[in-house]
A protein has these predicted regions:
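Class I S-adenosyl-L-methionine
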Residues: 1-194
Length: 194
């Protein structure tokens, strides 16, 4: 379990260190979970206690340093109305949770609930077209397409936005990812037919 007070102190320490280096800084990015999720262990349900602890720590730290810490993460958790309420409450406190999707249908579902979405793709241009066909705007992750761009400069994933961020899958895991996405899409398609 995460200790909210320790997390708040850690966030403040990091914020003060960054502000000492650059006092005119207008935002500090905090990404929770480079790997992992915010689910209750062994389930696909959002762990409301974990989310509340993180969001509360960010909110508390921002009261001290002036709303400059932008917290964000990604989740593969099931997105229902209860999860949507948790996600919206966290965003209000400064912790933006992106629905991490593998199909356009998952993106549509998340966006219909007002949740920011990202999607993994083996063909980002094709995914952009698929999103456009259902009335959504997608753009590939700027850090993947712009020389010298990184998450700290972009901060798009930490912002409330209309655009769906497309993460192009590359490298040695592309084949495995393609297969996993195809299996996931096939399962989703079969469930839709029931």
């Amino acid at each position: 379990m995460i200790n909210g007070e320790h997390l708040k102190i850690g966030l403040l320490e990091g914020a003060f260190n960054k502000l000492r280096k650059n006092p005119t800084r207008d935002s500090i990015l905090f990404r929770h979970n480079v790997a992992g999720d915010i689910a209750i262990e062994g389930t696909s349900l959002i762990d409301v206690n974990r989310v509340d602890t993180i969001a509360g720590a960010i909110e508390g730290a921002n009261k001290v340093v002036g709303e400059i810490i932008k917290g964000y993460t990604f989740t593969h958790c099931m997105i229902d109305l209860h999860a949507s309420d948790i996600i919206h409450d966290a965003a209000y406190k400064g912790f933006l949770i992106n629905a991490s999707c593998e199909t356009v249908e998952e993106v549509k579902h998340a966006k219909a609930l007002g949740i920011n979405a990202v999607i993994a793709s083996v063909d980002p241009k094709e995914t952009e077209k698929e999103l456009k066909a259902v009335g959504l705007y997608g753009a590939q992750c700027p850090a993947q397409v712009k020389e010298g761009m990184d998450c700290n400069h972009c901060q798009l994933c930490a912002k409330n936005r209309k655009v769906v961020i497309i993460f192009g899958i590359h490298g040695s895991h592309k084949g495995k990812a393609r297969k996993a996405i195809q299996i996931h899409r096939a399962k989703a398609s079969n469930l839709a037919k029931l």
